[in-house]
Amino acid sequence: MGDPKEAGAEASPSGAAARGGLSLLSQADSEEPSAQGSALFLGGNEVKSRAVVKYSSAPPRTAFARLEEKTDLKLPPANWLRESAKLGPAGTTILGNSKKSKPFSSFGMAYDFIDSVGNDVDVVSDSENIKKLLKIPYSKSHVSMAVHRIGRTLLLDELDIQELFMRSSQTGDWTWLKEFYQRLIDQKWQRKKKSKEHWYQKAILSKFLYYSINGDGAAQPVPSPAEQEESSSSQQTHESEGAAWPAPFEMPSSVSEDPSASSQGREPLEPSCIVGHVASAPKEQNLTTLFNDGENSQGLKNDFVRNILWTFEDIHMLVGSNMPIFGGGRYPAVSLRLRDNNKPINVLTGIDYWLDNLICNVPELVMCFHVNGIVQKYEMIKTEEIPNLENSNFSTKVIKDIAQNILSFLKSNCTKEGHTYWLFKASGSDIVKLYDLTTLCEETEDKYQNPFTMPVAILLYKVACNMMMKKNQNKKHYGTIRTLLLNCVKLLDKSRHPQIIASANYMLSELFQLDEPKKEESSDSPLNENSDESYSEEEEEMADSDENGSYSTSSDPADDNKAVAIIKSVGELSVPEKYKSIHQIRPSCAFPVCHDTEERCRLVLSYVLEGLKSVDSSIKKESDLPAADPSTPIPLKYEDESTRGGPEGLEKQMALFLDKMGSIQKGSCSGQSGMTPGSWQHKMKLQLILKSSKAYYILSDAAMSLQKYGRALRYIKLALQSHDTYCCLCTNMLSEVLLFLSQYLTLCGDIQLMLAQNANNRAAHLEEFNYQTKEDQEILHSLHRESSCQGFAWATDLSTDLESQLSVSCKCYEAANEILQFSDLKSQNPEHYVQVLKRMGNIRNEIGVFYMNQAAALQGERVVSKSVSAAEQQLWKKSFSCFEKGIHNFESIDDATNAALLLCNTGRLMRVCAQAHCGAEDEFKREFSPEEGLYYSKAVDYYLKALRSLGTRDMHPIVWDSVNWELSTTYFTMATLQQDYAPLSRKAQEQIEKEVSEAMMKSLKHCDVDSATARQPLCQYRAATIHHRLASMYHSCLRNQVGDEHLRKQHRVLADLHYSKAAKLFQLLKDAPCELLRVQLERVAFAEFQMSSQNSNVGKLKTLSGALDIMVRTEHAFQLIRKELVEECDQPKNDEATPAADSSPNLNREEVIKLLSIFESRLSFLLLQSIKLMSSSKRKMSSNAEEDIVLQTNKQIYSQLLRATANRNSTLLERIEVVICLLEQLASGSSRSSGSAVP
């Protein structure tokens, strides 16, 4: 801790407000001297002292009146005990006539300067207590002080044993301490009365000070004897009363937690420091009475004239002082003292004077000497000269060592925050003992007999509030805040202080960031590395360490064993750094490390539950409600799905929900427990319920990511139930809370969708959904005190019906969107709005696909009736409506990709509609109907819209390829149906052929055979099939065409072209040997048809040669067939258990046999025709070696083929192998003939 940077009177943010409206003094107006840090050099020993006035209620300084010699101070001045404009409102206090310091004076200062407590300041105390501690080695007087630890700060207050036990005799409390004290000093306690000399000295000092401020004593009448007697008795009464101790047993009647209790006459205070991003918690009403004047003030008001931040060497102290300060000396400020001339100043008095001047930064002391009340003379003494006065010599260095040793002793042993420690030294004793009164009190019947409990708890709470309110507060201090709050809750009785406990538990829940991943473990300043020296309750139980043992080795009476630590001799305090070795930072209060989200949320919910219990216990109307039994399930309203009406019922519930949300906006909701809106119970319960809803939402989201959908639905149900209760209590719904609700409903929609898609694990999901912890039950019971929690039951049912689940999911998204619409959150949260619309589009796509599949299933079940049923048409309409709405959702957020996917699905729906109209007529008489054409055309339109939506393939290649494929399929299907079921009754053959050709070419255009994608083989097969069909169509046209030679030639060229392309594409595929073989056979048939129209043998031979060449190129197809047959034959041998049906799934044996028979016959025919033509041409023409080779080869192959076909016992594989062998011979023969022809 460094020295304060500012000089002079510094203002506390809460000083004036909390002090009855007294204004803070500026540096210019302050009656204090400038608080510049000063180094005093006394006797060669340097002592550093710096004083900064943080607050002062004193009026501007006035010069003291120097009394004439022989003035009789025994006579009262005219202004004695009367108010004066020169004195201001704190006149009697300034002149030292106020009653003694209250036992909670340090708490009053701590409340006013809460920023300094816990970290910046080492000690907070009355200056009288500081002086008493520093005089311990010099004084035989008894010392009795209460010590409290708040973080790094120690609060010191006088613990007046006499006053305490006098009260004990009247009320019966504190008896445990009285008995302990009597055992400790081994004698019966008796109250010691003040001597007459004591009262005489106080009276003469008071009169002297009044004389010193009175410039004209004769101007005012002397008080009458009756007034003097009254004043004197009043003063003695104050002295006899001493401190005003609060009643530790019950709460005073005025300290009511009833929000309707009168608050007239109370001073305004700063609100309690409850942090929360929704709203601030109410101020603690109990705090109000603790700070006000009157019989119930309990002494917690900061009534010091000055609050000074005093730095003595390295010790930082917040000190309260009432010392009178005057002007009129050689310096701007002096302190005024009255001394008996016959009694020399002793060391104790010198230390008193020196410390007072140091603390108040007063550079000079004015001493007035008297004899028997008669003024003799005045003497001016500088502050730095006080330690060197005759008979009052003391070492300032020793005072510094005493201060450092005492602070080290206390900090090392007062380790438990919130505990009351008692620093005690008996009169005439050299032993100083430290006791833990809180621990001793807990051993009694009523552990709340400690009157310090409430002030300490409030201070712990306020310090924690203040730390959380700081915007620049590092999260590493969260451990400190948590420790402060836990100790606060531990100190208080739940039944007596529900508001503080509820607030503290809410703040504890706020420490955990629910909506952020845990990042502290990897940061530079983790939470468990606090710089604060306080620590959590788990770390309190420490074994006897060396440092503690060094204080407890005394063999004093048995009660000494209960002392936390002992200083065996006060002389040790004067030894430099005697206790420095033990003045160390204690283990830091580690913030709990939550390893996962669920653990973190569960911790938050535990604090929320404790807070809710505190609130519920304080509501008066609780007796009117039946007691909640956590073990008894809460009956929930339930409607059977059959009576609820499915989606129609959901529509009604949605309408009711939206109406309810509208009423919330108007503030017409109220709870059932009787809480008064605006009361602390009402506000705190709202905060706690909102926190619980957030925690359950995060738990649900975490379960969702783990695919635990039943658990996720249970948590989101609890979140929505919490929010429903919040809605019932809230009179003015904040936009942020509405945003939370939209997020909850969005997540609920996600969960319902995932449950619909994972129906196979329904039993496990149901088990998770029905499980409930005791903590959840208790929170739910608290919610049921305010609401039925059924507002969102429609969204959280776990249905077994797929359609119902999808509908619920959709309604959740719609509700989330409606909230964003009517609360104008759409523009404020554009990202969430986009996500909601995406989900709406997605769920409508899912529902549209569901209805489309149902329609397709109905279509497949049609056997008797071939007309389209009304049910199918209704499903088409539902599906189309969902797709249309989904497309609108995606288009509204410019999501072209998803809009294209839904347009694609709409195209698919049109194809389903087209397929439904294909079975209207008998299969043999069937024609491609106009309805089919209409729906296929609509499908094409939607696919084209999808492509236009995407723009280019680069935008989203996968979606683009998918839409392209579907469009190609639609064109192909439409062309195939027109080709296979030509509508000849409505259209001419030529028109049909033209339409088929155009559709096929469009299909081919959208069939990408070049891109190396997973769909490439399918595209190649589709393209090959298209070419094959076109070739077959032109071949058929050529056969049936008569007349137009130009058209015939065109058809012949196109047929040859498409056959060639089909063969090439099928050649690339490894799983289409039959298709390749069929194409080649059709090409051979096409060659035979051409040959039939030829007249010359040369032309026929050329055509035959081309046909045989096509036959040779079929070897590849036969090789593939042979390979599959071999694998099929080997399969049973390798694995007898594997059925043969599993092998060669792509090979159709019947089709292979059929094609093989055709192939054998056509090869036989071609070979025979070739042999005939070549033989006849050989007879007519001269011999040709090349032709001889070909002829000879053809004869051999023909002979072998005849023998093979004649053998009826050959297997399919053997026949295939023979064909392959013959084709190889035919190919080699052709190559030899070609080779011999080369010169």
UniProtKB/Swiss-Prot annotation:
Single GO cellular component term: nucleus
InterPro entries membership: EDRF1_N, EDRF1_TPR
Keyword Phosphoprotein: no
Signal sequence coordinates: none
Keywords: Activator, Nucleus, Repeat, TPR repeat, Transcription, Transcription regulation
Comp. bias intervals (Acidic residues): 530-547
Compartment list: Nucleus
Residue ranges of TPR repeats: 693-726, 914-953
Domain of life: Eukaryota
Region feature (Disordered): 1-39, 219-269, 517-559, 620-646
Biased composition (Low complexity): 9-28, 253-263
Broad class of where this protein is predominantly found: nucleus
Stated role: Transcription factor involved in erythroid differentiation. Involved in transcriptional activation of the globin gene.
Protein name per the record: Erythroid differentiation-related factor 1
Organism whose genome encodes this protein: Mus musculus (Mouse)
Taxonomy of the source species: Eukaryota, Metazoa, Chordata, Craniata, Vertebrata
Gene: Edrf1
